[in-house]
UniProtKB/Swiss-Prot annotation:
SUPFAM superfamilies: Carbamate kinase-like. One of its GO terms (biological process) is arginine biosynthetic process via ornithine. Catalyzes the ATP-dependent phosphorylation of N-acetyl-L-glutamate. The keyword ATP-binding applies. This is Acetylglutamate kinase. GO terms for molecular function: acetylglutamate kinase activity; ATP binding.
Amino acid sequence: MEFENIISAADKARILAEALPYIRRFSGSVAVIKYGGNAMTEPALKEGFARDVVLLKLVGIHPVIVHGGGPQINAMLEKVGKKGEFVQGMRVTDKETMDIVEMVLGGHVNKEIVSMINTYGGHAVGVSGRDDHFIKAKKLLVDTPEQNSVDIGQVGTVESIDTGLVKGLIERGCIPVVAPVGVGEKGEAFNINADLVAGKLAEELNAEKLLMMTNIAGVMDKTGNLLTKLTPKRIDGLIADGTLYGGMLPKIASAVEAAVNGVKATHIIDGRLPNALLLEIFTDAGIGSMILGRGEDA
């Protein structure tokens, strides 16, 4: 056996030994994963994500995927000559845009994720929040520095989640893949930020972990240093001084709310890293930023 292969084998053995306590600890638990960013668009990362999700299921963890689809929605809007607009990180969604959002998220994106997971041996099932009306939504009004309660169209916030559908899929050995579209009291569709859906679903499922995949290493301070542990108080300060803004705001808000409301560990991790999920769940060091419901920052 060549020397490099001996090293490779030794590394693999070490990794497995390090992972074993975590496999035992988390077996039988739910991990809600917000899937987005480069991990959804780069072929190698997409395939790696699917393999990692299947592995989680094989070792007894129950992954529940909530996906975004911003780049795909933008591409479709561009095709039809419609410009995307955002307010405080939320997509302005008129009726035409909502039709496109629902088509892209519930159709193309959801089915692609399901197909890829199943290709690697999983049993994924795609659902939208409108299926069985399991995600009830209400209109979201956004406050801006210039104006309070701005109406940005068919954009919603989660009013309630009936977890029966998702729990039923888990009990059947399936991997639920959730498109973040909710339903209003009149049956109308609402575009809901995927981070908000993931956080609320993690709360309602009493998840062990909420993992949010992003295109950054985690939460950074103004000098570019990674903040590995954060409390709500520290996060309030980072928002106040402008360190956190735009699209990070709903992600952070969802992570904090989930941590405060009982999700045992909430993480913002770098989805550009191969095997990011496994690195966070099964290694001593972990990656990214952990959001704590209470306690001291590290």
